[in-house]
């Protein structure tokens, strides 16, 4: 099972135009027999079963490591189903979607509804000749480093990662740390990577703030949206 998530209260309580998918288009992509089998394994007093096991220290570590191949294979499975959806309803979902100039020099990496604002800002900046872009994260876990690398234009010189969370005491926020780790040994190892926070508590993120992110070339750690 996967957790499909969005940005919380603000997104779930706004009035917005949406496009719905016809279930007739999607039902062929779902293995209903597998879903029924999964549901039948649910805990039920009418057909009780025992779950879980106690593992001693001599085997627990091995059991935890044994699941690695399944997580390693998962991004390709997700992309396969994204391709099926794309073919069926005309979307263009990838693990990481890029939007912006093909020769961008400064890009943002972000996930969630802020990407709508970023895209509008990119259109404005590109019309003025700016070389900017954004990588939209579609699959966060498992994090596929190669898919991220493939989505970034070779011309990039600076990356600003936006996180909508704060991890007190940590060296950085989760998405930023993932991007740094993914690019460390790649062709982008010399690219400057900045980190910023935005939108906590449903604070507005405006196009002007996104412009400020693209114009920032000095402050490696920053916030946007706080005006006190």
Question: Model-found features: residue ranges?
Answer:
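Conformationally flexible catalytic loops at phosphate/diphosphate-handling active centers
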Residues: 2-98
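Generic beta-strand/beta-sheet core signal
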Residues: 5-7, 109-112, 135-138, 161-164, ...
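Glycine-rich beta-alpha junction loops
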Residues: 6-13, 33, 112-114, 166, ...
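Short acidic, glycine/serine/threonine-rich loops at helix termini
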Residues: 13-20, 119-121, 147, 170-174, ...
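Short, solvent-exposed amphipathic alpha-helical segments in soluble enzyme
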Residues: 19-22, 120-129, 149-153, 176-178, ...
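A general structural motif
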Residues: 77-93, 110-118, 138-145
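Redox- and metal-dependent alpha/beta enzyme cores, enriched for Fe-S-associated oxidoreductases
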Residues: 103-130, 143-150
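Peripheral docking tails and interdomain loops at the edges
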Residues: 158-228
């Amino acid at each position: 099972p996967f957790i499909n998530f969005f940005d919380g209260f603000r997104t779930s309580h706004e009035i917005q135009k949406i496009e719905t998918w016809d279930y007739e288009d999607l039902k062929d992509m779902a293995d209903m027999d597998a879903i029924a089998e999964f549901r039948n394994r649910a805990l039920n007093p009418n057909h009780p079963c025992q779950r879980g096991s106690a593992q001693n220290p001599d085997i627990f570590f091995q059991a935890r490591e044994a699941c690695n191949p399944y997580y390693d294979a998962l991004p390709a499975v997700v992309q396969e189903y994204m391709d099926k959806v794309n073919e069926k309803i005309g979307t263009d979902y990838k693990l990481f979607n890029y939007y912006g100039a093909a020769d961008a020099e400064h890009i943002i990496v972000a996930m969630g509804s802020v990407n709508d604002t970023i895209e509008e800002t990119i259109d404005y900046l590109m019309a003025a000749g700016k070389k900017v872009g954004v990588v939209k994260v579609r699959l966060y876990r498992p994090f596929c480093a190669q898919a991220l690398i493939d989505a970034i234009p070779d011309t990039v010189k600076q990356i600003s990662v936006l996180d909508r969370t704060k991890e007190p005491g940590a060296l950085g926020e989760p998405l930023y740390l993932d991007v740094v780790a993914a690019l460390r040994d790649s062709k982008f190892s010399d690219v400057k990577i900045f980190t910023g926070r935005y939108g906590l508590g449903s604070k507005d993120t405006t196009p002007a703030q996104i412009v400020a992110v693209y114009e920032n070339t000095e402050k490696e750690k920053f916030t946007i949206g706080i005006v006190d």
